[in-house]
Amino acid sequence: MKNRLLFLGPPGAGKGTQAARICDSNGMKHLSTGDLLRSEVAAGSELGKEAEAVMNRGELVSDQLVLAIVESQMKALSGEGWLLDGFPRTVPQAEALEPLLNELKQPIEAVVLLELDDAVLITRMLSRGRADDNEDVIRNRLEVYRDKTAPLISYYQNKGLLISVPAQGSVEEITERICKVLD
């Protein structure tokens, strides 16, 4: 199974849930930028306060901040497999990440795109109960995804790394689909 992965997809598509399942069953490190940022917010650090204000507006945290977090996490890994969830979100971030991964001799092996309709995404996100999940913020996040993140689809498709997976159905069904395409 490929073990250096990137998950893409709109907010609410199940990236975090599926990433955790894939990592647990395959002994991979789950690098979730969303979780890293939320832990900074919970810690109340200056960085966390800055990130919280941006996230509460449904906007993206700066490239420099997220790349620094990812770099420190990647350097701490000793050759184990990893799954990057929530970064990169823009083509410039992907272009900044690539030389870092090449320097670490850990290039991405596959990019899994979880695809799901907006109506299902909105329903899922409203049911999560996160402070930053209200309908206006969710619609803004979907718009930001379309503007900033969706161009990554063609970026990774052109590199021959993109694998699309339908993200409807039960958690188990989606995990099974992902495992099948990664073998």
Curated annotation (Swiss-Prot):
EC number(s) stated in the UniProt entry for this protein: 2.7.4.3
Disulphide bridges, residue numbers: none
Catalyzed reactions per annotation: AMP + ATP = 2 ADP
Annotated binding of AMP, by residue: T33, R38, E59, L60, V61, G86, F87, P88, R89, Q93, R130, R141
One biological process term in Gene Ontology: AMP salvage
Pathway the protein takes part in: Purine metabolism; AMP biosynthesis via salvage pathway; AMP from ADP: step 1/1
Keyword Translocase: no
EC category: transferase
CDD domains given in the database record: ADK
Superkingdom per UniProt: Bacteria
One protein family per Pfam: ADK
GO molecular function: adenylate kinase activity; ATP binding
Keywords of the record: ATP-binding, Cytoplasm, Kinase, Nucleotide biosynthesis, Nucleotide-binding, Transferase
Subcellular location: Cytoplasm
GO cellular component term, pick one: cytoplasm
NCBIfam families per the UniProt record, alphabetical: PRK00279.1-3 (NF001381), PRK14527.1 (NF011100), PRK14531.1 (NF011104), PRK14532.1 (NF011105)
Subunit structure: Monomer.
Assigned protein family: Belongs to the adenylate kinase family.
Domain notes: Consists of three domains, a large central CORE domain and two small peripheral domains, NMPbind and LID, which undergo movements during catalysis. The LID domain closes over the site of phosphoryl transfer upon ATP binding. Assembling and dissambling the active center during each catalytic cycle provides an effective means to prevent ATP hydrolysis.
HAMAP family: Adenylate_kinase_Adk
Name listed for the protein in its UniProt record: Adenylate kinase
Native source organism of the sequence: Synechococcus sp. (strain CC9902)
Gene name, Swiss-Prot/TrEMBL: adk
